[in-house]
Amino acid sequence: MLSDSRVSLQDVSFTYEEAPSPALSEISAAIRPGEFIAVLGHNGSGKSTLAKLVNALYIPSKGNVVVCGYDTRDEKLVWEIRRRAGMIFQNPDNQIVATVVKEDVAFGLENLGVPTEEMIPRIEQALSVVRMTKYMDSAPHMLSGGQKQRVAIAGILAMEPSVIIADEATAMLDPSGRKEVLETVRMLNQTKGITVLWITHFMEEAAQADRVLVITDGKIELEGTPAEVFDHVEKMKEMHLDVPHMTSLADELRKEGMPLPGGILTVEDMAREVEKVLCPSKSAT
């Protein structure tokens, strides 16, 4: 375990009641402050269970989960952990609790007992950061799915978290909604140093992470940078997972004899490397 880790999982196992086998089995990982970690896995792999363990919604059957220095096994620290590690769920409608946007953002602060005079600027700042200020007095049901998720992010941001856990937060959104939510969380990660645990089944989202964990049958099977993980094309297929489109295309072109390097994730990567192969004199200048 890294001594400076923001989130640490130490030989963590978790078994649901009456389940024949553990959902997670002896998982160990360390997430550093400011890292953006993507977690991939097929349905039932254990990735959502991992999210709930980090947020102290679940307590491990074995092992320890430590968030910002707090062990989730200590019941007295649960609310402190949840203040520091905010969670965005899959369905935005399931986390809207008020009839006005600014009141929804205030909900978590009220539970923390934050004084009104401190609450108001924190709400305004949070909505400003996620670009939702003009909807402050709107009814949440009038918003798009992406806008609702940004309101949920504002509610977390107002509590000044160290960690954001997104449990398939873009799964129910259209492409434009997915883009705006990912861009918002990535911006918070880069400008405020908030650590992000981004659970997704969209490979292009995972390709933007600093590091990727791939979970299958409750165990971490692959770990590394997006380029390192997605270069295991055949192993990913064996785990019933895709890779980014450009990574898959590069793999097919290599099989046809084109000498492309590994680590191709985006259209820009592909264009650059194909140009090097087809026009070596041009790429050298």
PLM segments and residue spans:
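The feature captures the beta-strand-to-loop junction immediately N-terminal to the Walker
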Residues: L40-H42
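Helix-to-loop junction immediately C-terminal to a conserved catalytic motif
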Residues: N55
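Conserved ABC transporter NBD signature motif
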Residues: G63-R73, I81
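Conserved ABC ATPase "signature" region
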Residues: E117-Y135
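Conserved ABC ATPase signature
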Residues: A139-L143, Q147
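Catalytic Walker B motif of ABC-type/P-loop ATPase nucleotide-binding domains
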Residues: I164-D167
